[in-house]
């Protein structure tokens, strides 16, 4: 039996930002560690919407993942949680 490790990509995050908060971003801009969610116009409620969508999609609780300030940090934390099964 093989275990598939799921990774949320910057492209997927950009799509979720559009869906959850109506914020359109270039996925390449999300890769820059210096850019914070606020720089893209995404507030905490929009980020919670993204977390909720990911929790539903992957059937995993992502507690405290909404506290990340940048997209890159968010992806690192979420992908780490998905890889570990946490």
UniProtKB/Swiss-Prot annotation:
Record Pfam families: PP-binding (PF00550)
Domain annotation Carrier: ranges: 7-86
Disulfide bonds: none
GO biological process terms on file: antibiotic biosynthetic process
PTM field: 4'-phosphopantetheine is transferred from CoA to a specific serine of the apo-ACP-like protein.
Entry keyword annotation includes Phosphoprotein: yes
Keywords: Antibiotic biosynthesis, Phosphopantetheine, Phosphoprotein
Record carries keyword Phosphoprotein: yes
Pathway in which the depicted protein is active: Antibiotic biosynthesis; curamycin biosynthesis
InterPro entries the UniProt entry points to: ACP-like_sf, PP-bd_ACP, Ppantetheine_attach_site
O-(pantetheine 4'-phosphoryl)serine: residues carrying this PTM: 44
Main function: Acyl carrier protein.
Name the record gives this protein: Curamycin polyketide synthase acyl carrier protein
Species annotation: Streptomyces cyaneus (Streptomyces curacoi)
Taxonomic classification: Bacteria, Bacillati, Actinomycetota, Actinomycetes, Kitasatosporales
């Amino acid at each position: 039996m093989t275990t598939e490790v799921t990774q949320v990509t910057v492209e997927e995050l950009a799509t979720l930002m559009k869906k959850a908060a109506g914020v359109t971003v270039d996925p390449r801009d999300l890769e820059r560690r210096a850019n914070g969610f606020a720089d893209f116009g995404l507030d905490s409620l929009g980020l919670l919407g993204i977390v909720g969508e990911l929790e539903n999609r992957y059937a995993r609780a992502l507690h405290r993942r909404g506290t990340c300030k940048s997209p890159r940090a968010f992806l690192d934390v979420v992908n780490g949680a998905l890889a570990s099964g946490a």
